[in-house]
Amino acid sequence: MDADSSSRSPRDTRTCARPKEKVPYFADEGRERDRVRNLRHRKTSITRPTTSHRGRPMRARSRSYSAERNCCQRRRRSRSCERRHSDTRHKLTTATVTKQRRRRSRSRSRSRSRTPRIITVPVPVPAADYPYAYAWPPPPQAPQFNPMYGAVPYGMPSRPVYPAHPYFAPYPRPRLTFPYRAPPFRPHPRFSYRNQRPAPN
Protein backbone atom coordinates (compact mmCIF):
# COMPACT_ATOMS: atom_id res chain seq x y z
CA MET A 1 0.00 0.00 0.00
CA ASP A 2 1.35 3.43 -0.95
CA ALA A 3 1.84 6.30 1.39
CA ASP A 4 -0.71 8.03 -0.78
CA SER A 5 -3.95 8.13 1.16
CA SER A 6 -6.09 7.87 -1.99
CA SER A 7 -4.98 4.29 -2.62
CA ARG A 8 -6.30 2.87 0.64
CA SER A 9 -8.42 -0.23 0.38
CA PRO A 10 -12.09 0.25 1.35
CA ARG A 11 -11.67 -2.34 4.12
CA ASP A 12 -9.08 -0.23 5.85
CA THR A 13 -10.47 0.99 9.15
CA ARG A 14 -7.83 3.27 10.43
CA THR A 15 -9.96 6.42 10.23
CA CYS A 16 -13.32 4.71 10.79
CA ALA A 17 -16.05 6.73 12.48
CA ARG A 18 -16.21 5.94 16.18
CA PRO A 19 -19.11 3.51 16.75
CA LYS A 20 -21.87 5.35 18.63
CA GLU A 21 -22.75 3.77 21.92
CA LYS A 22 -25.81 1.55 21.93
CA VAL A 23 -28.97 3.06 23.39
CA PRO A 24 -31.48 0.64 24.86
CA TYR A 25 -33.97 -0.73 22.40
CA PHE A 26 -36.94 1.17 23.77
CA ALA A 27 -35.10 4.46 23.25
CA ASP A 28 -33.95 3.69 19.71
CA GLU A 29 -36.91 4.25 17.45
CA GLY A 30 -35.90 1.98 14.61
CA ARG A 31 -34.91 -0.96 16.79
CA GLU A 32 -38.07 -0.66 18.83
CA ARG A 33 -40.19 -0.59 15.67
CA ASP A 34 -38.77 -3.79 14.21
CA ARG A 35 -38.79 -5.45 17.64
CA VAL A 36 -42.53 -4.87 17.85
CA ARG A 37 -43.00 -6.02 14.27
CA ASN A 38 -41.07 -9.19 14.97
CA LEU A 39 -43.24 -9.83 17.98
CA ARG A 40 -46.34 -9.41 15.87
CA HIS A 41 -45.19 -11.57 12.99
CA ARG A 42 -43.54 -14.28 15.02
CA LYS A 43 -45.08 -17.67 14.48
CA THR A 44 -46.62 -18.98 17.65
CA SER A 45 -46.48 -22.72 17.99
CA ILE A 46 -49.41 -24.16 19.90
CA THR A 47 -48.79 -27.36 21.76
CA ARG A 48 -51.78 -29.65 21.52
CA PRO A 49 -53.00 -30.80 24.91
CA THR A 50 -52.18 -34.33 25.91
CA THR A 51 -55.72 -35.16 27.01
CA SER A 52 -57.86 -37.28 24.78
CA HIS A 53 -59.84 -34.96 22.58
CA ARG A 54 -63.06 -36.94 22.52
CA GLY A 55 -65.18 -38.34 25.27
CA ARG A 56 -65.88 -36.98 28.69
CA PRO A 57 -65.04 -38.23 32.17
CA MET A 58 -67.29 -41.06 33.18
CA ARG A 59 -69.19 -39.26 35.92
CA ALA A 60 -69.52 -35.89 34.20
CA ARG A 61 -73.02 -35.42 32.86
CA SER A 62 -72.73 -32.26 30.87
CA ARG A 63 -70.78 -32.20 27.66
CA SER A 64 -69.87 -28.57 28.12
CA TYR A 65 -67.35 -29.56 30.77
CA SER A 66 -65.69 -32.34 28.77
CA ALA A 67 -62.42 -32.57 26.92
CA GLU A 68 -64.50 -32.95 23.81
CA ARG A 69 -64.89 -29.18 23.83
CA ASN A 70 -62.13 -26.69 23.48
CA CYS A 71 -60.34 -26.78 26.80
CA CYS A 72 -59.83 -23.05 27.20
CA GLN A 73 -62.92 -21.64 25.53
CA ARG A 74 -66.36 -23.11 26.15
CA ARG A 75 -68.44 -22.28 23.13
CA ARG A 76 -72.15 -22.81 22.82
CA ARG A 77 -72.62 -24.34 19.42
CA SER A 78 -74.37 -27.41 18.16
CA ARG A 79 -72.57 -30.71 18.55
CA SER A 80 -72.72 -31.54 14.84
CA CYS A 81 -71.02 -28.29 14.00
CA GLU A 82 -68.43 -29.05 16.65
CA ARG A 83 -67.84 -32.52 15.28
CA ARG A 84 -67.35 -31.02 11.87
CA HIS A 85 -64.72 -28.62 13.19
CA SER A 86 -63.17 -31.01 15.68
CA ASP A 87 -59.87 -31.43 13.80
CA THR A 88 -59.52 -27.68 13.24
CA ARG A 89 -60.05 -26.85 16.86
CA HIS A 90 -56.47 -27.14 18.02
CA LYS A 91 -54.79 -25.91 14.83
CA LEU A 92 -55.28 -22.19 15.27
CA THR A 93 -53.61 -19.90 12.76
CA THR A 94 -51.92 -16.70 13.79
CA ALA A 95 -54.84 -14.58 12.65
CA THR A 96 -57.23 -16.62 14.76
CA VAL A 97 -54.94 -16.32 17.74
CA THR A 98 -54.75 -12.57 17.37
CA LYS A 99 -58.48 -12.31 16.85
CA GLN A 100 -59.21 -14.44 19.90
CA ARG A 101 -56.79 -12.45 21.98
CA ARG A 102 -58.44 -9.22 20.93
CA ARG A 103 -61.97 -10.43 21.53
CA ARG A 104 -63.66 -9.04 24.61
CA SER A 105 -64.09 -11.44 27.44
CA ARG A 106 -67.61 -12.21 28.52
CA SER A 107 -69.10 -9.67 30.88
CA ARG A 108 -68.69 -10.51 34.54
CA SER A 109 -72.43 -10.34 35.15
CA ARG A 110 -73.05 -13.36 32.91
CA SER A 111 -72.24 -16.13 35.28
CA ARG A 112 -70.09 -19.01 34.09
CA SER A 113 -71.56 -21.35 36.65
CA ARG A 114 -74.01 -24.10 35.77
CA THR A 115 -77.77 -23.87 35.87
CA PRO A 116 -78.74 -22.01 39.03
CA ARG A 117 -80.34 -24.24 41.58
CA ILE A 118 -83.65 -23.15 43.06
CA ILE A 119 -83.10 -22.98 46.78
CA THR A 120 -86.16 -23.74 48.88
CA VAL A 121 -86.07 -22.46 52.42
CA PRO A 122 -88.83 -23.38 54.88
CA VAL A 123 -90.13 -20.07 56.13
CA PRO A 124 -92.53 -20.16 59.06
CA VAL A 125 -95.69 -18.53 57.79
CA PRO A 126 -97.98 -17.23 60.50
CA ALA A 127 -101.57 -18.46 60.41
CA ALA A 128 -100.89 -21.20 57.89
CA ASP A 129 -104.20 -22.93 58.68
CA TYR A 130 -106.35 -20.13 57.33
CA PRO A 131 -108.00 -20.60 53.93
CA TYR A 132 -106.17 -19.49 50.83
CA ALA A 133 -107.93 -16.17 50.20
CA TYR A 134 -107.86 -15.13 53.83
CA ALA A 135 -106.46 -11.69 54.34
CA TRP A 136 -106.16 -9.65 57.49
CA PRO A 137 -107.18 -6.94 57.87
CA PRO A 138 -109.97 -7.82 55.46
CA PRO A 139 -109.77 -5.86 52.20
CA PRO A 140 -112.03 -2.82 52.10
CA GLN A 141 -115.33 -3.66 50.47
CA ALA A 142 -115.89 -1.43 47.50
CA PRO A 143 -119.56 -0.96 46.70
CA GLN A 144 -120.21 -3.67 44.14
CA PHE A 145 -122.08 -2.75 40.99
CA ASN A 146 -122.56 -5.74 38.71
CA PRO A 147 -125.19 -5.07 36.04
CA MET A 148 -125.54 -8.76 35.26
CA TYR A 149 -127.36 -9.47 38.48
CA GLY A 150 -130.20 -7.54 40.00
CA ALA A 151 -129.72 -5.17 42.86
CA VAL A 152 -128.45 -7.12 45.82
CA PRO A 153 -128.32 -5.42 49.18
CA TYR A 154 -124.69 -4.53 49.89
CA GLY A 155 -123.69 -5.76 46.43
CA MET A 156 -122.41 -9.22 45.65
CA PRO A 157 -120.27 -10.77 48.33
CA SER A 158 -116.73 -10.77 46.97
CA ARG A 159 -116.08 -14.30 48.21
CA PRO A 160 -118.22 -16.84 50.02
CA VAL A 161 -118.13 -16.68 53.77
CA TYR A 162 -115.88 -19.54 54.85
CA PRO A 163 -117.10 -22.23 55.39
CA ALA A 164 -120.16 -21.59 53.28
CA HIS A 165 -122.58 -24.41 54.18
CA PRO A 166 -121.40 -27.21 56.43
CA TYR A 167 -123.68 -29.92 55.06
CA PHE A 168 -122.82 -32.58 57.62
CA ALA A 169 -123.21 -30.62 60.79
CA PRO A 170 -124.61 -32.39 63.86
CA TYR A 171 -127.50 -29.93 63.91
CA PRO A 172 -128.70 -27.24 61.51
CA ARG A 173 -126.76 -24.12 62.21
CA PRO A 174 -128.46 -20.77 62.51
CA ARG A 175 -128.22 -18.52 59.49
CA LEU A 176 -125.28 -16.21 59.69
CA THR A 177 -127.03 -13.33 57.96
CA PHE A 178 -130.13 -11.59 59.19
CA PRO A 179 -132.13 -10.42 56.18
CA TYR A 180 -134.41 -8.27 58.28
CA ARG A 181 -131.40 -6.15 59.19
CA ALA A 182 -130.74 -5.36 55.53
CA PRO A 183 -131.22 -1.66 54.72
CA PRO A 184 -134.18 -0.65 52.58
CA PHE A 185 -133.61 -1.33 48.91
CA ARG A 186 -132.51 1.70 46.91
CA PRO A 187 -132.33 1.16 43.15
CA HIS A 188 -129.00 1.91 41.59
CA PRO A 189 -129.12 5.28 39.86
CA ARG A 190 -127.27 4.05 36.74
CA PHE A 191 -128.99 0.71 36.26
CA SER A 192 -132.28 -0.01 34.53
CA TYR A 193 -134.26 -2.80 36.16
CA ARG A 194 -136.77 -3.46 33.34
CA ASN A 195 -136.68 -6.71 31.33
CA GLN A 196 -134.92 -8.53 34.10
CA ARG A 197 -134.13 -12.16 33.48
CA PRO A 198 -133.51 -14.30 36.53
CA ALA A 199 -129.87 -14.25 37.46
CA PRO A 200 -127.89 -17.17 36.01
CA ASN A 201 -126.78 -19.60 38.66
From Swiss-Prot:
It is found in: Nucleus speckle. It comes from Drosophila hydei (Fruit fly). Residues 38-62, 99-115 have a biased composition (Basic residues). The gene is tra. This is Female-specific protein transformer. Transmembrane segments: none annotated. Member of the regulatory pathway controlling female somatic sexual differentiation, regulated by Sxl. Activates dsx female-specific splicing by promoting the formation of a splicing enhancer complex which consists of tra, tra2 and sr proteins. The sexual regulation of tra occurs through a mechanism of sex-specific alternative RNA splicing. The non-sex-specific RNA expressed in males is not translated. GO terms for biological process: cell differentiation; female sex differentiation; mRNA processing. Residues 9-37 have a biased composition (Basic and acidic residues). One of its GO terms (cellular component) is nuclear speck. InterPro entries: Tra. Keywords: Differentiation, Nucleus, Sexual differentiation. Residues 1-117 are annotated as: Disordered. RS domain directs localization of proteins to the speckled subnuclear compartment and the purpose of this localization is to allow colocalization and co-concentration of components of the splicing and splicing regulatory machinery to permit relatively high rates and/or efficiencies of reaction and interaction.
